[in-house]
Structures are given as C-alpha cells and as structure tokens.
Amino acid sequence: MVVIGEKFPEVEVTTTHGKLKLPEHYIESGKWFVLFSHPGDFTPVCTTEFVAFQKRYDQFRELNTELIGLSIDQVFSHIKWVEWIKEKLDVDIEFPIIADDRGELAVKLGMISPYKGNNTVRAVFVVDATGTIRAIIYYPQEVGRNMDEIVRLVKALQTADKGYATPANWPNNDFLNEKVIVPPANNMDARKKRLEACKSGELEGYDWWFCYTDLKE
C-alpha cells in the first residue's frame, strides 16, 4: 500500500484508450493526473460520478491535470458503459478507464476493503508531474464524491508548490477568504522579519506565526 509522498508505482495498464504506462505517460507530457476508482460499471452512483467528472474535465485540464478511472472490470464492460452514458445521458466520457480485471493495481493501491467485498471503494489519488503521490482520499462505496472538492484539492496542492498553505474551505475561508497562508517562521531572525513584513504592509497577519497574503500568480 502506498502513501502520500511516495512515487506512484510503475505499471502498465489496459484502458479504454489502449495500453498506458503509469506514471510514465503523464510524466513525459508534464502533467498531473487524478486516478479514481469506482466499484463497478453500470451502477447508479458510479454513473453520476463519471458524468460529474466529465463535466469538470475542462477545469482539470486548465490545471494541467488529466483524469483516469479504474475498476475491477474488463475493458469491454467499460466500453459498453461509456456507450450507454453517451446514448442515455448525452455525455461523452473523454478520459480513459483502466480495466484492472484481476484487481492487481487496486490491491497495490489499497483500494479494496476486506469489509466491502471484492470491488474497490471510491479512492482518489492525486499525482503530480514528477509521479509523486500528493493526496489520497477514500470514500465508502455508498457515498458519491464531491468533484468540486477534488478540483479544489488540485488547485490547493499546486498553490502549495508556490510556497503557500491554504486555509480551511479555501478559497472561501470564513475570515481570510481567498488569501493564502505564509508558512510560519522557523527561527528568531525569520520571526523578526515576518513581524516587520506585517508592520510594513508587505504581509497581513495576526502574529508572527499567522501571516497571510494574496496569492501571487
């Protein structure tokens, strides 16, 4: 089982778009990717999730991020399900879906709960352009995911790469709104400079350890 900060395991997978090598395929194109598992094709909650992901696909692409689904099904099932979604719901699923028919990748990624049978839970892995796992979320099979939160998560992680932290519910925090947090000073000299920056207006803050600013693009 993998954890945040590790490299995504190197695997070759069969998808609805052909064979792909992960994470190599996305590293070579300099892209992040969100890998998400679903319990099974032709199921109601999973269908609503795929439609929701597709409707936000452009938002992910604007963040230089691709989507890739996964379940313990055969590729033929994925193809028929995607066709059904197009025919019945008029939504064209553009991103690939991994056919992990033996469940090998699902086991490696800890997507299967011994208390929930042989299907995957609703896992989400956010992987950056270096192939490093940046975030992992698990949802139970009976609870559909909030795709806007996953978009927000990717934005927040990319903001962290600029040297900032994000407050609760960012960018709609209760008192900081869309502002981002400057990491606390870690020595006395930095503490002094941080206080001076707040006093001069370069930063805003409540104390030397709680400073914030507008996100600079």
Swiss-Prot record:
One of its GO terms (molecular function) is thioredoxin peroxidase activity. Residues 2-159 form the Thioredoxin domain. Signal peptide: none annotated. It is an enzyme of class 1 (oxidoreductase). The active site is at residue 46. Thiol-specific peroxidase that catalyzes the reduction of hydrogen peroxide and organic hydroperoxides to water and alcohols, respectively. Plays a role in cell protection against oxidative stress by detoxifying peroxides. Belongs to the peroxiredoxin family. Prx6 subfamily. This is Peroxiredoxin.
